[in-house]
Amino acid sequence: MGNVISGGSRPENHRDRTSPPYPNPNAQYQGNYPSPYQDCARYPYGEMASPVQYVEHQEAVTIRNDINLKKETLRLEPDEQNPGKFLLSFTFDASVPGSITVMFFAKEGKDCNLIATKEDLFPSTQVSFAKGLEQRFKQACGTGIDFSDMSEADLVEANETDVYHVAVKAEVVSEDDHPESGTPNRQITHVVLEKDHKGEYKARVVKQILWVNGNRYVLQEIYGIGNTVDDNGEDANERGKECVICLSEPRDTTVLPCRHMCMCSGCAKLLRFQTNLCPICRQPVDRLLEITVNNNDRN
């Protein structure tokens, strides 16, 4: 007798047992098999690149600063009439008359008011000044600080309690007989005292604050905006001031928080959609600040 195939069934299809069966709508399969074209449907041209983080672009607001202490000029000088004491000196510009107050071991209070914490040991001094540029300030003889009156522990304790070793307050004096109510405009300079490799104390500015029209501002350096003059009288800011991207337009945009002024506003607006890294230091960028600088001719 021959072989009989009952029910008209087809011979078994010998497939690779390692591959999943073809989809069958009548099969009671629990679960889903991955599609070989699933990733191609999502990324037809390969893996999608992550989007660049949006960087905010802002324009700077000009604030009038009537008094400016040049922090790079601040130093301690020996008191020739009082051996062992040191006097604070610095250079400043003032467009209006005002007063300068020097405090030792002072902390900042409300509305940028300074509070002397050791007034009995280190009395504060105050002097008035007229308006003018490149004025030099130096404490009067006998009013300086004697380092033998303090210890290393005093300096460390001050740092841990938000007390600055030295604080300089440059304050505007009202030109009329009826000064405005509230705290007058002022600039506060906070200084710490540190020993150098010779064991001598040096003064170092750590913070400068502006109080203008009831608002508090912290001053920060911007790299690439300084106006310097070389030995030949040439403005160094005129050389190499071009945008580092297009190499043609002047720099007017600062990268924050690294504070590199390195781009023009046009390149900055385009670059913020392509990368969020500073072109100079490659640090992440939070904001772009457009600053208009007016370089007036020096007299």
Swiss-Prot record:
Reaction it catalyzes: S-ubiquitinyl-[E2 ubiquitin-conjugating enzyme]-L-cysteine + [acceptor protein]-L-lysine = [E2 ubiquitin-conjugating enzyme]-L-cysteine + N(6)-ubiquitinyl-[acceptor protein]-L-lysine
Zinc finger regions, RING-type: 243-282
Superkingdom classification of source: Eukaryota
Start and end residues of each stretch annotated as Disordered: 1-33
Protein's UniProt keywords contain Zinc: yes
GO molecular function: ubiquitin protein ligase activity; ubiquitin-protein transferase activity; zinc ion binding
Record region (DAR2 domain): 90-208
GO process terms (BP): protein ubiquitination
UniProt key word NAD: no
This enzyme's EC code(s): 2.3.2.27
Lipidated sites in chain (N-myristoyl glycine): 2
Alphabetized InterPro entries for the sequence: LOG2-like_mRING_C3HC5, MGRN1/RNF157-like, Znf_RING, Znf_RING/FYVE/PHD
Pathway: Protein modification; protein ubiquitination
Keyword annotations of the record: Lipoprotein, Metal-binding, Myristate, Transferase, Ubl conjugation pathway, Zinc, Zinc-finger
General function of this protein: Acts as an E3 ubiquitin-protein ligase, or as part of E3 complex, which accepts ubiquitin from specific E2 ubiquitin-conjugating enzymes and then transfers it to substrates (in vitro).
Family label: Belongs to the RING-type zinc finger family. LOG2 subfamily.
Domain commentary: The RING-type zinc finger domain mediates binding to an E2 ubiquitin-conjugating enzyme.
Matches recorded under PANTHER family: E3 UBIQUITIN-PROTEIN LIGASE LUL2-RELATED, MAHOGUNIN
Name listed for the protein in its UniProt record: Probable E3 ubiquitin-protein ligase LUL2
Taxonomic placement: Eukaryota, Viridiplantae, Streptophyta, Embryophyta, Tracheophyta
